Amino acid sequence: TVAFGSCNYINEESVDRPGKGYGNGYEIYESIHAKKPNIMLWGGDNVYLREADWDSKTGIYHRYTHTRSIKELQPLLASTQNFAIWDDHDFGPNDGDRSFYFKYETQNAFKNFWANKTYGTDANQKEGIYSTFNWGDAQFFLLDDRFFKSPNDRLTGEKTIIGSTQFEWLIDALSSSKATFKIIVIGGQVLNPSARFENYQN
């Protein structure tokens, strides 16, 4: 059994925007744990970095530890294999892209908190959090839609979301996969033909 989830906003009043906080319903993690999944697959926005967090290693690690500390999440983290990708809010600013100046720090934090089996093309991979793993008769391909992404407002050059290195890695990995089921995980819309903001078509 594979459980999927994303958009894990944990309130912290001192750094949240005015008004009612976005986060609630944390008991969902207890419900997921009760189903005893073999894998929990986190589809991005697993933490929500705030404006106060982006500019420092201290802020980034505070956000991760604060998010991970809620009691409802502990049984799921302790008893289930967890794999993850990121999206904009755990990468950095809203709708973040490759121009984000602190992306290596957020990448390091991500790797420290998520024990994916591999990262990138080899053990020395320094850029991106894409990875793959096998489970039973399925192979999962976890893509990074932020580290290499072109800025939304860029007017020149060819735009990309996953970059050429990751794209070639994906094609090679899919071609050589012997798994019956191949599951691609990415933090944005891919099949929607409408060229809308933050859409693969766009």
Feature annotation, model-predicted:
Residues 1-202:
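Metal-dependent phosphoester/phosphodiester hydrolase catalytic core
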